């Protein structure tokens, strides 16, 4: 789940709810109907060639042929004509890459063929669009109206264009596209499955909570399938050695326990989910790791749910209305209160050893009657204050959990309380045997490029804690509660295309600051950032008495990874990159809309598309959506500062790698790759800003002819730079399958996307 905080994203969610009424439409995809014109792809001969290029080696050849209603041989001939690498049977199930497939075919295929490609029923796709981490939001709340796409033998013009593309790729990447020793996508999972028992390892006896998300777990209904791998033994082992003692999972309460007489609709398939949860808990326990369930409850229900005359009192549990024909389950009513408490008590009695839960009770999902501030529209809740309603929603969770598991942790997150403002009025009404969690960096004042603002969340470039978290922790401590900092130590939506951003000075500074606060634990990631990294080790190194200095921790880590000779160079590199990262042009609009996740994989469009950038989905060419509150030139300038500082750091890190002990080469070469990916992405986004500005100026009717000639000259080096960046990033992706991956978005880009960027840029140069 993404937790947006900008007005625009909140509007997205309201529109989503207005567009969906799950389970009541004759056509499950009716709420997601196609309406807009698909984006043109002028650099390919036709749509068939585009489809083959974008899906080659991502799904089985036979399925590509099935979609196009042709033979595998015809599809293979198209791929060969374009100069694509030899066919390799994908080693992953479609479920593991379906989001990537949907996104890259959104403008190519109608729903019927999209369903064939991703092997889904209309019901499953509708569920994915609505429930799988806001996929419909990430696709822009629209489906382009695509004509059916069937194979036709390429005509002479198409053959000629395909041959030109093949020539471009062979001359710039080399036959067979330098993929001979390339790793397949998702190869990192196999690496993370490997265990390496260490008889000398001694687990920390620290009582501090350190919990995180699984790096590669599917976000949706994770426990519904016996075949779903939530995490591997190797991943748990690695996380445990880095001081992690908890992993969290997303669940929906009504799917985890029987609903009883009052809610017979609930609980279908709960037996399997409970059985799988037991297995997960037992697996994690072997590595001294507890499992925590994410509670975002109670979920709203369609209005028809409250109209069942055969269930006594059903109409009385209807609470505040929600958009889209939904209504809250009112937590002021005994039936709903008992259901919440009984369901949680059931889960914790059926799954001994479950670590606990954490709640979000003010998220973008409409849950209890005050989750979006509308408690006064509820007949039962309107006599209470908003703070009382929010506190009650959390108290019910605490009571249910502790009825069966008195020692389980109940972590209450203040996200969204009082519109992200000060919420001490809620804290003072909570039960005291809970842990109060707050985003560390929230409300920090920052200035980037002379532009002032305050931080929301998802920022490594802004070092917490901020004033809101400190005030809330203090209020919690005064009532005898525990306090938890929510942080992102590996990566954020500032850039999520690498497992971790090697800005160790920033991580150490944040951990050091938190060590001075009276807190009891950390949530170390949301769905992004769960990789077992040196950034996590920094947190572990601070978890000692007496607390070491930042310099001591960084020196220790550098020497461990790079040896005595390489350590000083690594430290210098980390400082250069950390200082550069402080210049990141942070804002909610930037982290959600700018092409920071895809870098050079985002195309240079020859003409304005008219499409708005989507939330960590498809950035298109929507510069005004990318830049947030920054003027375009300042936005680009800040990105160039980050890129330049990383380039300087990479020079030092390259020298450090050369001096490092051989046993650590694999890990530190990966660190160097990730630094280079970050540098490439930010240089590319700066290029894209300048390109769009020039392109749009060129397109204005009032632009003089002489100025247009100047613009063309200014655009050429930008296009040439993008070719070079795409070529380098392509090589890096062949070496490391984790580049471009994030669990809820799967692959932001794959190697072929960078080949397409090269092709499109050469087309522009012509």
Could you describe each region identified by the protein language model?
Residues 1-11:
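Bacterial N-terminal signal peptides that target proteins for export
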Residues 9-22:
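Bacterial N-terminal signal peptides
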Residues 27-202:
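Long, charge-rich, low-complexity intrinsically disordered regions
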Residues 39, 268-275, 327-338, 380-389, ...:
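Alpha-helix capping and helix-loop boundary segments enriched in small/acidic/polar residues
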Residues 70, 120, 244, 287-289, ...:
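Short glycine/serine/threonine/alanine-rich loop segments
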Residues 131, 136-142, 158-362, 367-375, ...:
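Feature activates predominantly on carbohydrate-active enzymes
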Residues 196-207, 217, 228-232, 349, ...:
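Substrate-binding groove of N-acetylhexosamine-processing glycoside hydrolases
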């Amino acid at each position: 789940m993404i937790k947006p905080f900008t007005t625009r994203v909140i509007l997205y969610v309201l529109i989503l709810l207005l567009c969906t009424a799950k389970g009541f439409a004759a056509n499950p995809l009716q709420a997601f109907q196609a309406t807009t014109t698909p984006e043109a792809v002028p650099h390919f001969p036709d749509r068939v060639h585009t489809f083959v290029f974008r899906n080659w080696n991502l799904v089985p050849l036979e399925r590509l042929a099935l979609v196009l209603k042709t033979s595998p041989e015809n599809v293979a001939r198209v791929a060969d004509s374009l100069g694509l690498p030899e066919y390799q049977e994908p080693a992953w199930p479609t479920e593991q890459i379906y989001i990537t497939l949907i996104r890259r075919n959104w403008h190519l295929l109608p729903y019927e063929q999209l369903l064939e490609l991703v092997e889904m029923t209309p019901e499953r796709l509708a569920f994915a669009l609505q429930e799988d981490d806001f996929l419909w939001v990430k696709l822009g709340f629209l489906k382009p109206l695509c004509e059916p796409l069937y194979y036709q033998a390429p005509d002479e013009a198409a053959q000629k264009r395909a041959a030109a593309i093949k020539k471009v790729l062979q001359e710039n990447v080399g036959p067979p596209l330098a993929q001979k020793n390339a790793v397949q996508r998702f190869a990192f999972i196999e690496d993370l499955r490997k265990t390496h028992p260490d008889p000398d390892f001694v687990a920390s006896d620290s009582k501090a909570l350190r919990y995180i998300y699984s790096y590669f777990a599917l976000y949706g209904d994770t426990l519904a399938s016996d075949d779903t791998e939530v995490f591997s033994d190797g991943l748990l082992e690695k996380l445990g050695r880095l001081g992690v003692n908890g992993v969290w999972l997303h669940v929906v309460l009504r799917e985890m326990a029987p609903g009883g007489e009052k809610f017979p609709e609930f609980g279908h398939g709960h037996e399997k989910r409970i059985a799988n949860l037991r297995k997960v808990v037992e697996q994690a326990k072997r590595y001294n790791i507890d499992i925590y369930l994410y509670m975002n409850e109670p979920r709203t229900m369609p209005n028809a749910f409250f109209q069942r005359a055969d269930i006594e009192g059903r109409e009385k549990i209807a609470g505040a209305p929600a958009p889209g024909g939904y209504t809250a389950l009112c937590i002021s009513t005994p039936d709903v209160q008992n259901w919440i408490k009984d369901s949680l008590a059931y889960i914790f009695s059926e799954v001994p050893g479950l670590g606990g839960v954490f709640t979000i009770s003010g998220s973008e999902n409409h849950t209890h009657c005050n989750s979006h501030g509308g408690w006064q529209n509820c007949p039962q809740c309107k006599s209470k204050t908003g703070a009382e309603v929010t506190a009650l929603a959390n108290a019910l969770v605490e009571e249910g959990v502790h009825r069966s598991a008195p020692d389980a942790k109940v972590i209450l997150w203040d996200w969204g309380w009082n519109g992200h403002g000060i919420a001490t009025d809620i804290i003072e009404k909570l039960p005291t045997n809970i842990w109060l969690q707050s985003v560390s960096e929230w409300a920090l004042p920052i200035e980037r490029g002379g532009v002032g603002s305050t931080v929301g969340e998802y920022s490594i470039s802004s070092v917490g804690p901020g004033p809101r978290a400190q005030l809330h922790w203090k209020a919690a401590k005064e009532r005898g509660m525990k306090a938890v900092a929510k942080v992102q130590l590996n990566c954020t939506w500032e850039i999520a295309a690498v497992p971790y951003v090697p800005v160790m000075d920033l991580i150490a500074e944040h951990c050091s600051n938190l060590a001075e606060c009276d807190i009891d634990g950390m949530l170390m990631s949301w769905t992004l950032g769960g990789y077992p990294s040196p950034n996590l080790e920094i947190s572990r190194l601070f978890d000692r008495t007496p607390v070491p200095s930042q310099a001591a921790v960084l020196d220790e880590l550098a020497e461990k990874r790079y040896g005595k000779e390489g350590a000083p160079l690594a430290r210098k590199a980390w400082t250069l990159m950390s200082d550069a990262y402080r210049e990141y042009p942070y804002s909610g609009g930037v982290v959600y809309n700018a092409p920071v996740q895809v870098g050079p994989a985002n195309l240079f469009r020859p003409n304005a598309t008219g499409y708005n950038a989507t939330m960590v989905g498809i950035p298109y060419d929507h510069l005004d959506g990318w830049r947030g509150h920054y003027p375009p030139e300042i936005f680009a300038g800040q990105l160039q500062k980050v890129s330049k500082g990383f380039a300087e750091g990479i020079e030092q890190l390259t020298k450090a790698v050369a001096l490092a002990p051989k046993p650590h080469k694999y890990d530190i070469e990966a660190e160097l790759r990730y630094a280079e990916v970050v540098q490439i992405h930010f240089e590319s986004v700066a290029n894209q800003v300048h390109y769009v500005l020039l392109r749009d100026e060129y397109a204005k009717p009032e632009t003089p002819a002489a100025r247009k000639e100047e613009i063309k000259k200014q655009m050429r080096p930008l296009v040439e730079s993008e070719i070079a960046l795409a070529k380098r990033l392509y090589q890096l992706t062949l070496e490391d399958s984790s580049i471009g991956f994030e669990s809820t978005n799967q692959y932001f880009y794959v190697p072929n996307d960078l080949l397409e960027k090269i092709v499109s840029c050469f087309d522009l140069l012509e």
